[in-house]
Amino acid sequence: MLIKINSNDIWLPIHFYDETFNFQLVLSIVELFSYLICAYILTLNIYIILKIKMFHRNLYILAIPLFGIWFELIIGKLITIAYRLKILNPGFELGVHIEIWTSDPTRKLKVESVNGLELLIFGGFLQWHYMFTIIFGVLAIAVERVVASVLIENYESNTQLFIPLFLTVISQFLSISTSLALLFQKVGPFLAQLPWIICCPFSAMAYFFVKKCNESFEREIRNPRRRRHFSVSQQFQVKENLRALYLGTRLVFVVLSCIALCGIGITALFYDLIPPFCCHFVENFLFLHPYLSCLTAIFSVPQWKNEFREVSVLGRCLKIGRLKIESENAMEIQDSTKKMGTETDLYFQQLADSWI
């Protein structure tokens, strides 16, 4: 959606559809219910990760906010829903805006001022900020793992927060500045692709460097004839880096799949290959991604998976059902044993009577 205010444009990653109010109301209720379940899974995911610490504190400082920032995205979505249902009413019709970007002036919302649109613009900024926080945040984590591999001699025992704080400040500066540049149309749709085009190759190179470096360390640790001495903390650091790679590989695959589906959907909508209604599915690939990413993270680490089964509602229900089945099976076995004992006693009694 693009808003034209005099000679300035505001670019929002928001869509408004040509749909009846009743349909929008029902759809919004379904979306809100889905977001509530998603929020529960995400909160449980963060709780388990913080409770059972499997990685270095610096990695936690960088990674946990990437999960938690989903709530920022949903705040932006809730603001959009409020405008769609006219709970927040700017005093004029917003119209239909399905395309993510357009150069056609007739397809832009023309207004004289931002009065009544302040929250909508803020919600759009939150969504832009979320997207670029993920992009630059993943690169920051990759850099942190490179540092952990290079400084393997004493990184595990290092308690200073300089590295994660520095990476957080840099990534947030880039995220906020890029989001504002897109929001106020200081860059076009082509330049908007540069952050992920640049970050993805660098993250991939960091991934392969960390993988090769730590696999080499692992082979050296297992070699009984090695000359280099690895302390317990260094051996732990190598194992941690490899665990992080395994987890990161699965998460990146899931996230890239969601991004690819969103990209394909947006392209199909831009060229009118699919009906506008499908845009609901396309944008919810982004809003509902914790269903896949959080469960992938939890089930990639056995300790987290076991804890999830213990504390989650689904896990408790399955546990109660399993205990009930086991109890019923035990009762059946007990009854069967008792019946067999009775039949055996009766048999021997009849056998004894036949000898009389």
Curated annotation (Swiss-Prot):
<feature type="transmembrane region" description="Helical">
    <location>
        <begin position="61"/>
        <end position="81"/>
    </location>
</feature>
<dbReference type="InterPro" id="IPR004151">
    <property type="entry name" value="7TM_GPCR_serpentine_rcpt_Sre"/>
</dbReference>
<feature type="transmembrane region" description="Helical">
    <location>
        <begin position="281"/>
        <end position="301"/>
    </location>
</feature>
<keyword id="KW-0812">Transmembrane</keyword>
<feature type="transmembrane region" description="Helical">
    <location>
        <begin position="119"/>
        <end position="139"/>
    </location>
</feature>
<feature type="transmembrane region" description="Helical">
    <location>
        <begin position="190"/>
        <end position="210"/>
    </location>
</feature>
<dbReference type="Pfam" id="PF03125">
    <property type="entry name" value="Sre"/>
</dbReference>
<dbReference type="GO" id="GO:0007606">
    <property type="term" value="P:sensory perception of chemical stimulus"/>
</dbReference>
<dbReference type="GO" id="GO:0016020">
    <property type="term" value="C:membrane"/>
</dbReference>
<feature type="transmembrane region" description="Helical">
    <location>
        <begin position="29"/>
        <end position="49"/>
    </location>
</feature>
<feature type="transmembrane region" description="Helical">
    <location>
        <begin position="161"/>
        <end position="181"/>
    </location>
</feature>
<keyword id="KW-0472">Membrane</keyword>
<comment type="similarity">
    <text>Belongs to the nematode receptor-like protein sre family.</text>
</comment>
<feature type="transmembrane region" description="Helical">
    <location>
        <begin position="251"/>
        <end position="271"/>
    </location>
</feature>
<protein>
    <recommendedName>
        <fullName>Serpentine receptor class epsilon-29</fullName>
    </recommendedName>
</protein>
<keyword id="KW-1133">Transmembrane helix</keyword>
